[in-house]
Regions:
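N-terminal signal-anchor transmembrane alpha helix of single-pass membrane proteins
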Residues: 1-28
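Active-site alpha/beta core segments
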Residues: 72-154
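Short acidic-hydrophobic, aromatic-tinged amphipathic segments that line or gate anion-handling sites
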Residues: 130-131, 204-216
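A short glycine-rich beta-strand->turn/loop micro-motif centered on a GG-aromatic cluster
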Residues: 156-160, 178-193
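Short Gly/Thr/Asp-enriched flexible loops that form oxyanion-binding sites at enzyme active sites
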Residues: 166-176
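Active-site-proximal loop->helix
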Residues: 190-203
Length: 217
């Protein structure tokens, strides 16, 4: 076997391995995680989870149309929910997407600080700020442990993208025994929202409006 042929075969094998690794990584990005079931807390609490409303997706630093910039009305609703949740004693947690893989960094606008911080228009009322590198927020062990430490058993999800990160986070929550609801007028997606919300319902994920949530807390 000539050296040239050997090198071609070697490069082909390396390329195949890299391709398989990339496909496996991509597949893992779009899967709900599994974890231990939460305990039956004697003093269960609720949490509002604000997902991926950050400068790289919704603010002035966005470059890729991962989601359409939200209207001021949608941000107003999210901020109103944050205020009400705080007043009622609910926990509020903020989740940010921070990709560690270079390919995903390039595709999603980079890892620069200006792109991964929470959208400046969103009210930050605490330091419950968690990073994830997959669609499911439960891929963050710190976030999962935070909910356990606070005895949370009920989650309300707002943010982007309703078709992916919020959806897989909701499934991750169900896998752990949480009661979970998505706030229909406080989420957004490039996909048709009616279809996205119907997908939630088929999976047993509750869909409520911000008005309904405000009346419950």
């Amino acid at each position: 076997m000539s050296i040239k042929l050997f090198l071609l075969i070697f490069l082909a094998v390396i390329l195949a391995i890299a391709l398989m690794a990339g496909m496996m990584m991509l597949r893992s990005m779009f899967m709900a995680t599994r974890g231990r079931k939460i305990a039956a807390y004697p003093d269960p609490r609720k949490a509002l989870v604000v997902l991926d409303i950050q400068e790289g997706y919704t603010g002035t630093a966005t470059r890729q149309p991962v989601t359409r910039p939200p209207t001021s009305g949608m941000l107003f609703i999210v901020n109103s929910l944050i205020e009400k949740a705080t007043e009622s004693g609910m926990e509020v947690a903020y989740i940010r997407q921070v990709f560690s893989n270079n390919l995903f960094v390039r595709l999603h606008g980079g890892r620069r600080q200006g792109r991964v911080i929470i959208d400046r228009r969103i009210k930050m009322i605490n330091d419950n700020d968690f990073e994830k590198n997959r669609t499911d927020a439960f891929s963050s062990r710190q976030f999962e442990q935070f909910l356990i430490d606070k005895h949370v058993n009920e989650l309300y999800l707002v943010g982007v993208d309703a078709a992916y990160c919020i959806y897989y986070t909701a499934l991750g929550a169900l896998n752990r025994g949480y009661k979970v609801a998505v706030i229909a007028d406080a989420v957004m997606s490039r996909k048709k929202m009616a279809d996205v919300l119907e997908r939630y319902k088929r999976k047993g994920i509750e869909v409520v409006t911000s008005e309904e949530l405000l009346s419950m807390v």
